[in-house]
Amino acid sequence: MTDFDTLVRLLRRWTHNHDPHVRAAVELLIEHETWIRRAGFQRACIEKNAREVWINWRKAREFADSGAVASTSEMAVLDLAVALGEDRYKFSIMGPANSRMIAQAVARAPGEDR
């Protein structure tokens, strides 16, 4: 298992020149911490070679769908992060107007704006 701070640094290096949806997915996992710290997630979803570390989104989807033991909210965060990483909702091709509309809808979804 890789040290958390080292893994965060390596993942951020990987996403530095990556698509925004991948950076968003990785940052969500980093900020949440739960999955990045879990040895099972690291073994199943994080790949590395001599130069870099990355998240294999296909394996991360399989991991999430396999029934990993976690709270409902932890699973929801993982599911959202994987969906972002996979570009499931095609954010990478959204124009500015749709991007703003989607961001506003997501911001309102938890009911925090009341």
What residue ranges belong to the model's regions?
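Extended, charge-biased low-complexity segments
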Residues: M1-A70, M75, G85-R114
